[in-house]
């Protein structure tokens, strides 16, 4: 089959926003205007098409990023048809993993902000992730019809809170009840959408007289931003020449692709105004797969040689699995992004991360949770495969003759865990299966069995994250579970360097004995300086320990790191230098050196000023002004460090850093303190030393 849409007319975009900025409604409108969706699904009554899990419809928040394909030829049918693949990303802070995962496979993003609430804490998290993956983006300021809507205020916040360089493409005509349309600052015309056909048609009109001066001022700002794209344009502009509409658009596009500016549009998705022009901006200013750098990877040649794949059908096939979802009718759906080449249903590909072959059974293009079977996918496509056996998020699928491993995604460690048990013994096996499946879908969620208590432990990014996992077990797998009290994922570390710590394991009792002897130094590493949180340096001179036993020493220490001497929590940020020891020709063995290393580690750890580390959360609370004192007092009681506060239209925003162990049940407490009027977000920030009294209590509770 030949390619139907040239790759330059593809746009792989994410729609990303804070909770309640109206992202789901915005996505619905995109699907409506692109002709996919004939009845607009309203999130207010739980009928939105993109939110395809029952819970999302109940909670009114988007959890799973579903991928959808749509086509757009422009508001005035001014373009050839463009194919837009939309990855819907969740806005709740417990689901940042989903956002991170979708950012990885996007070429561009639309950031949706609320015209009243502006740039929220979660918006900042998403912004950082988009920066990390260098995703070009534009902004859509939604809810211009709401009380308190202020477009230019939000433009200001994009500058001050996100440190970005926002350039408005439009101005709002009116606001709140009086919001009627937008001024297009490139064409210098007003756009008036037709209410009778839900905004499918529109008219260009003259800019209202009372807005002429403001429009001229912001038009100048737009032209200046465009002129900065090149010296030629700057000379033309400074020489007093007019820039053509084409020149302005090309220059702005170049600057968006270079991540130098953020173009800002506005509207009200709910009132059918503005989404149409934002779609035009996606085509005019966001990149196609050929506008972004080739994806980097490493060859599977034993030397990890760097390689890249360009967005072309002629290169070998390569794709990245970015999401695994369980579908009640077909089982596993593996969402993947094709970076290069072509693959047909029925083809065999290589999972280069696991060095296993997989057969592409059926390939489907998704529209929210409806699907259409397709025979092939090409560079730039996003689709889902049914029936892949052993693929996890972040795996590379590629041509078996040209193996490559694309960059791995990095997933955060969980910060909270709870014990779960099925309500009936009969459900034990079912629960195991359910949790295994859910863990495969979501790498930030972990499951294990506690060896001492034999309980099943689940761990994730926050209380809501785990609530939803328990909820999904019940809905999708019919397993009801009892849930224990949440536990904090503490860590252990050392604060001092210790030298010449000896570990000796010697047993001579008739026959072959065991002998291992090591001398090590232990020292703290700078937090975050080593991705593994551990380094091992072999400084043995003159063969006092033979080379074959060195890995056993390393392994002996690594095994101890899983359960530290203080309270049995993982040890992090530790460096070990092995520099002396001795061995016995007959009695030495790998096991003896492993045991000697573990003896030295335990001895050294005790002397190296061991500390217990606790997870600290970044907490932001928005509260009515009259409750500020109570909220701050409560955060202080929870050992919170106040980091600042600012006045908002809706009250006061408080920034604090609080230990996770003090935040359990916070939602309920905040509701009662503020009669339900405050809201908060919380995300993991860092690990820090726990105060003595806290550490002691934790150590005693663990029976150490």
Swiss-Prot record:
Keywords: Cytoplasm, Elongation factor, GTP-binding, Nucleotide-binding, Protein biosynthesis. One of its GO terms (biological process) is ribosome disassembly. The keyword Nucleus does not apply. One of its GO terms (cellular component) is cytosol. It holds the Pfam family EFG_C. GO terms for molecular function: GTP binding; GTPase activity; guanosine tetraphosphate binding; translation elongation factor activity. InterPro entries: EFG_II, EFG_III, EFG_III/V, EFG_IV, EFG_V, EFG_V-like, EFTu-like_2, G_TR_CS. Belongs to the TRAFAC class translation factor GTPase superfamily. Classic translation factor GTPase family. EF-G/EF-2 subfamily. Catalyzes the GTP-dependent ribosomal translocation step during translation elongation. During this step, the ribosome changes from the pre-translocational (PRE) to the post-translocational (POST) state as the newly formed A-site-bound peptidyl-tRNA and P-site-bound deacylated tRNA move to the P and E sites, respectively. Catalyzes the coordinated movement of the two tRNA molecules, the mRNA and conformational changes in the ribosome. This is Elongation factor G. It comes from Salmonella typhimurium (strain LT2 / SGSC1412 / ATCC 700720). The gene is fusA.
